[in-house]
Design a protein with these regions (language model features):
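A short, flexible loop at the N-terminus of ABC-type nucleotide-binding domains that lies
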Residues: 1, 10-24, 74
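Conserved beta-strand-loop-alpha-helix hinge in the C-terminal portion
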Residues: 226-252
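The feature captures the beta-strand-to-loop junction immediately N-terminal to the Walker
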Residues: 38-40
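Conserved ABC transporter NBD signature motif
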Residues: 61-68, 229-231
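H-loop/switch region of ABC-family ATPase nucleotide-binding domains
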Residues: 206-207
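ABC ATPase NBD coupling module
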Residues: 15-16, 57, 69-83, 91, ...
Length: 264
């Protein structure tokens, strides 16, 4: 479904600040897989998602989605079949627009728009049902401005907007990191629920080892722009945080991981 073939990316090449963020990285995701990605700061996790999303050109390698070569496809064109949720709840929504208007924008992404714009009654009923599934009461507040929502409500709405058109690939970039633990748990639960319901192929970055182990069907660990661990099936189900820390130390050559990586 998603295939990355030896992709590389170096920032500030030819300078003293040159840094290789992706080092001939190869990865294949099957349709419907939910893969969690962990690693220390600078491991290349966000660079990986940005490369897939087309946020910048890669230096080498190939990116295939559903067999189509999208390596040189610009970001705005990839947005038609990718969904993405960022760490900052303020990103991904229009704060001065209503909840239903935000959903309408997301639903029409990639489509040709005419001079007439508005939310139809049928669309409002569709959005009401989708919002009710979040369990946050937003279906009764569809005329509210998004800027008035809490961080958790806004992130849940962003998740819904990213998946309303059932994208080929869902990218979750530490999307619960800025939320309090209770709200983060709720958004994470919703993420898994929506991915399972719609059979979405999902790539989720997290610094929380417990979440990385508990979520999805596969776990990969990055270090130095490479994938150093790739676990699935029974091997992943048997994992503990202690096991993961031991494996991280073994493959990275460090005594212990960064504090942020150990959050659990």
């Amino acid at each position: 479904m998603l295939e990355l073939k030896e992709i590389t990316k170096t920032f500030h090449p030819g300078t003293v600040n040159a840094r290789r963020a992706l080092d001939r990285l190869s990865l294949t995701l099957e349709e419907g897989e939910f893969v969690t990605v962990i690693g220390g700061n600078g491991a290349g996790k966000s660079t990986l998602l940005n490369a897939v999303a087309g946020a910048f050109p890669i230096d080498g390698g190939q990116i295939l989605l559903d067999g189509q070569d999208v390596t040189h496809m610009p970001e705005h064109r990839r947005a038609a079949f990718l969904g993405r949720v960022f760490q900052d709840p303020m990103m991904g929504t229009a704060p001065t627009m209503q909840i239903d208007e935000n959903l309408a924008l997301a639903a029409r992404r990639g489509r040709r728009r005419g001079l007439k714009w508005g939310v139809t009654r049928a669309e409002r009923e569709e959005y009401r049902a989708l919002l009710a599934g979040l369990g946050l009461g937003l279906e009764d507040r569809m005329s509210a401005k998004v800027g008035l929502l809490s961080g958790g409500q806004r992130q849940a709405l962003t998740l819904l907007m990213a998946t309303v058109r059932r994208p080929k690939l869902l990218l979750l970039d530490e999307h619960t990191a800025a939320l309090d633990p209770k709200t983060a748990g709720k958004v994470l639960e919703l993420s898994q629920q929506i991915a399972r319901r719609d059979g979405l192929t999902t790539l989720m970055i997290t610094h929380n080892m417990k979440d990385a182990i508990a979520c999805g069907s596969r776990l990969i660990m990055m270090d130095g722009g490479r994938i150093v661990l790739d676990l699935a099936g029974e091997e992943k189900r048997r994992l503990t945080v202690a096991d993961l820390l031991e494996r991280f130390s073994a493959v990275s050559g460090r005594e212990e991981a960064e504090d942020k990586l150990l959050l659990s």
